[in-house]
Amino acid sequence: MTIRLNKVTRDLNVGITTVVEFLQKKGYTIEASPNAKITEEQYAVLVKEFSTDKNLKIESEKFSQERQNKDRNKASISIEGFESKKEKEEVVKTVIPEEARPKLKQVGKIDLDNLNKKTAPKVVEPAAKVIEQTPKAEPVVEKVVERKETPQPEKETPKPVVVEEKKPEPAPQPAPAPVLEEKKEPKIEKTEEKTPQVKEMEKETPEAAPVQEKEEDDVFKIRPTEFKSKINVVGQIDLAALNQSTRPKKKSKEEKRKEREEKDKQRQEQRKLMKDAIIKEIRKGDDKISKNSVNDDAAKKKKRNRINKERVDINAAGTTNAGGASNNNQRNDNANRPNRNNNSKPNGNNNQGGGKFNKDRFKKPVVKAEVSDEDVAKQVKETLARLTNKTKNKAAKYRKEKRENVQNRLMEQEEMEQEDSKILKLTEFVTANELASMMDIPVTQVIATCMSIGIMVSINQRLDAETINLVAEEFGYKTEYVSAEVAQAITEEEDNEEDLQPRAPIVTVMGHVDHGKTSLLDYIRKANVIAGEAGGITQHIGAYNVKLEDGRHITFLDTPGHEAFTAMRARGAKVTDIAIIIVAADDNVMPQTKEAINHAMAAGVPIVFAINKVDKPHANPDKIKEELAAMNFLVEEWGGKYQSQDISAKKGTGVHDLLEKVLLEAEMLDLKANPDRKATGSIIESSLDKGRGYVATMLVANGTLKMGDIVLAGTSYGKVKAMFNERNQRIKEAGPSEPVLILGLNGAPAAGDTFHVIDTEQEARDIANKREQLQREQGLRTQKLLTLDEVGRRLALGDFHELNVIVKGDVDGSVEALSDSLIKLSTEQVQVNVIHKGVGQISESDVTLAAASDAIIVGFQVRPSSSAGKLAEQEGVDIRKYSVIYDAIEEVKAAMEGMLAPTLKEQITATIEVREVFNITKVGLVAGAMVKTGKVKRSDKARLIRDGIVVFTGAINALKRFKDDVKEVGTNFECGISLTNCNDIKVGDIIEAYEEVEVKQTL
């Protein structure tokens, strides 16, 4: 036998989840649904565990039942008169349509009026039946009543109709009410006359008149053996009539009003006592609280005793009545009060029952009044407790203040932490990538934000303070520069106007790769620089000081045009005075050209356009000018403000005119500098030379750099031991706008850093150490540890790989450009991590790091030392050496693609038409088919297609030709073919044979 879970929870007084969890612990798994079923064995386990809960429920139900009975007894007293009014009102509405009065008289309830009319013939019929059942007169009388009720009241009387109409409402009582109210006076008279008739009833056969008289005594003895449903109606109406003599007299309106006023006075007095108690307790202390609470309890007890007494009086009065309705409710304690107790049973057949529920509901406010007094007392105590706390000693007050202070401190600390989480502590050395890591956003968003404010940046490009502030503010962060004290340590000297002297302009040549930037400089310098560059493309910033025929000097910076050298172009534009943008006349305005123009515009540098290669047959300078005009750059020839010159860098056509225009722009700028002060400027490039140590190419912006000066650049410092110009000739000093190569630094400063000449080496060392410390802190801040979210993302991808790379190069700019390009190759599936980058040859420490982190080493124009090469062979570390940046990027990209798992691609090999189907025993269906296209192989997979819909997909089970197994069948040949586990082949179906081919993934 199974039991529903809903019933089990109600029986055991526990929740469904509790039952399910307990059964799961015991090894039973059931659904957590009220309709789920459990076995007897599981039920026994539950009963054993939760028997205490079941007992508690039974006890609580008993307790609540007793309390309800008490509440009803109380309610019957206080609202009796109030309800009688409503009964009267309802009687008026229901008396007219009901024909219950004559029918009730026929039953024998009102025998005096209709004794001789209708009851006599009806009594005769059941008399014979009664004799068959019981010889006594008493049961016969009652059963006569039953027989009369069964045919007449159920069919004719409207009592069952009343039940249907008034069940939704709680008051279906008005039907019998008219009998109670209207026939009080005649019934009181009849009780006096009926006393002699009771004696006659014992001797004579039963009649309808004595039936009502004998009910007073007989009901208590016989009713337990009778059916409740049929006698309920009779008993209620009789009691209402017969109990009038013993029932307490109904109170008049004045008496009820007086009672209500007395109760109100009592409540007001109690409230006054409460208020007085509060005042006394405040004045006298805790001692009198207990006394007052005792008095309050006493007052409440008095009230309850008074109600109980009234209840007992009514019960006593009720016991004198021989109410037939005691049989209606054998289980109730107050059986002598039928109209009230019948209603407490929801399954009673009495139609009057609903009305008494209304009495209970009207009584509820009275009960709540008592509860509210308790609440008042409770609130009084709480109020006093709060008031008396203030009068305690100073120690308690001190402890409270201490607790509050601790809480305030904790709250302030939390607020500070929240604010700190939105404050970025950084130095001015921060790159775009590091800034993105600190803000925990993609680096593409940082670059996009910079582009929106007109600044072109790359991933590894260092940002200045102003840009960092703008970007951080865009994403809701505040910045705090921890390097402020270091910056203040270097004081800038103010130049006097009279000390300033004209200086040579610094001109940057920018443009797309292969558009002729270096060729132009070659012609100007009369030297072939390109021959020295690997692959014929510029990979370093070249800084050259050119002396013109008229004795004037121009410093040229040649920037790379390849897209990887974004940072170099940005640096070139940053330190320059004028920008020459070269565009090939036989090409278009390319992406790097646009980027170079944007860099120059962001730096606020005047632009001169040089349209190169005009000597070529397909050259079209006007097309270039048209494209520039579309970008809002109108040249002077077309009525704009930008100067342009058509040139041929190889032949030298127009180069002289171009230089004149550049010098004209320089004169308009009025460039001046003070040569008689300590030098400042920018680091253009830095590298590690095996014979000479760390070498830095600098461009002096102001002042004069001399041999022996103490130079501080970024985290590197040192004494200038030797100086060379761009032709590797030794010089003693370098003035403003002169490029110079110096030896003597203790490290390779980052390209783009500014340099200063410091008074003492000690001061330079201190500042450099502080900067190095800040840089290490910055590195720790930007280190992004592996989070659970990232682990989850990688697991979700399934095929995730990391490629760790160590980049070493000859100069800092190239290292930065290469690492930048490699990081850009990262995808969701393969992530490139540049774990270390540096300038100089590949050392043993690089190999050790690569072995520990499972990385490859990419050397750009550098070679490993002999010891590093041997160690790499032992450790199995892969060292790749490149001279052109294109090759490095392509090979790393190929390595990343090799790490990806190949994808499977379907390739259709043949289509076969089914001509005939054979059903062979122990084999199944075999299709006789013709190969329409392609060549079907035994190893292929197949799809069965019917009317263009795929019916089956699976493997080829057998492939035969003339009873011989074959490996393949070509086009226009017949064959027999069967598919594995396919028994639904029909004539006209198409079988499509295909094979799965592994395809290498691309990035």
Curated annotation (Swiss-Prot):
UniProt-listed CDD domains: IF2_eIF5B, IF2_mtIF2_II, mtIF2_IVc
Cysteines joined through disulfide linkages: none
Subcellular location: Cytoplasm
Domain tr-type G residue range list: 502-672
Compositional bias of kind Low complexity: 315-350
Region: G2, residue numbers: 536-540
Function: One of the essential components for the initiation of protein synthesis. Protects formylmethionyl-tRNA from spontaneous hydrolysis and promotes its binding to the 30S ribosomal subunits. Also involved in the hydrolysis of GTP during the formation of the 70S ribosomal complex.
InterPro entries to which the protein is assigned, alphabetical: EF-G-like_DII, IF2_II, IF2_N, P-loop_NTPase, Small_GTP-bd, T_Tr_GTP-bd_dom, TF_IF2_bacterial-like, TIF_IF2
Gene for this chain: infB
Recorded coiled-coil stretches: none
Annotated stretches, region: G5: 648-650
Ranges where the record places region G3: 558-561
Protein name in the entry: Translation initiation factor IF-2
Claim: Translocase is one of the keywords in the record: no
Region: Disordered, residue numbers: 61-81, 135-362
Family in the record: Belongs to the TRAFAC class translation factor GTPase superfamily. Classic translation factor GTPase family. IF-2 subfamily.
